[in-house]
Each structure stands twice: as C-alpha cells, then as structure tokens.
C-alpha cells in the first residue's frame, strides 16, 4: 500500500483454524500485564518487592554480590539479574559490549476507537516508510504502531489532533469506519541491540538488557518472557 493511494487490494490472510483451534496469539495491554504481575508478586511468600527504589552501586565478587540502594540499604545475593533495558547500566558496568544497529525509523504509537468492531483481527500494512500495524484491543479500540522515517516522524507527531488523525485514517483505511483518538501519542526510535554475552561474574542479563529487536514481528516482549 501507499498513504497517497490508500490500502492496496493485495493481501495475505492467515487463518488460525487451518492449523488448530487456538488463535495464533493474544494481544494484552501493558497495564493489564503489569497489574497482573504486581498482584501475583504480592501473593508470593518467597518474593520481596522493594519499590520504589534505585540502585546506587553493584559490587560482584566470587562469593556473591552486594547491591546498594539509593537509600543506603545493602542487599546481598548470589546472582544479580539485569533486566534494566537496552541501555542497561548493569551491562555497561560489567564491561559487556553490545552490537547495535539503528534503522533510521521511529515508531509512532497511539490508540484509536472506531465505528465498527474489529472482530479481534490484527492487520499490518507494509508501506514505503515501514509497517503500519493495527492491533485489536478491548471494545472498539485499536492500538496503532506506525513506523515512519525518523526525519519525518516529528512533523507528523507535531500535527494537531485533527491533522494527525487524518494521517492515521489515510493509512488505516475506512474498513472500521471513522476513527477517534483515544489518549496520547508517543514515539520511540527503532534499533537492534545484541549483547556480546549474556552472563558475567554473578550476573545474568535478560530481556532487552541482552537483546532488542525491531517490533515488526511483535516478539520483543515474548523473547523477554522466554528468558525467564
């Protein structure tokens, strides 16, 4: 497809019933996942949640590790697990390098409501500037992940609501009727990152502290969960 010409009539449809009864996957809102994990964490007797908290220093040695918090408390452990994101301070402090690649693309993310039901169907358009993903949410709402050239993304995000929604609608098409913005829009740069190694002395890196990929396949979170 192309924004100026609308949605292409060419498409590839994946039908999960051809391989089984279950859907290919589920889309769960971040706030729901975080809420569920927080609730579960409070029920586990062998887990202590310390929040809010910031780590001041981490000292790792042959016998274990000492983690000093900003408030002065020191936690002693046999293993430090770094799950502190693609710019992981733990990875850097351990001297573990990483290979990185910038795609010169920016993801513009927003949520829209629409007149017609999406029937739980996810759609991804492949446009010249990058994929435009429409991910079904609860009710008549859809999350948009619009990949755009980094040079152009600020101009689109800087439009007023009517102008921005018009650009979204041109790409989205009218298959779900008129759209309405729900909540804020935000952006993040897209890039690849892979740590040279995942472990160090009394240290293990997981999730985006170890590996980060392009969101086109929607597997970043899944890969992080698999690490656990």
Predicted regions and their residues:
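Conserved FAD/dinucleotide-binding core of flavoprotein oxidoreductases
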Residues: 127-190
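Conserved N-terminal helical subregion
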Residues: 1-93, 101-106, 161
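Central beta-strand plus flanking loop segment that forms part of the substrate or channel wall
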Residues: 87-122, 132, 140-142, 148-152, ...
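Conserved mid-domain beta->alpha element of the FAD-binding
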Residues: 188-228
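Short, conserved catalytic or interaction motifs in soluble domains
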Residues: 60, 114, 215-218
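Short Gly/Pro-enriched turn/cap motifs at secondary-structure boundaries
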Residues: 99-102, 122-126, 187, 195
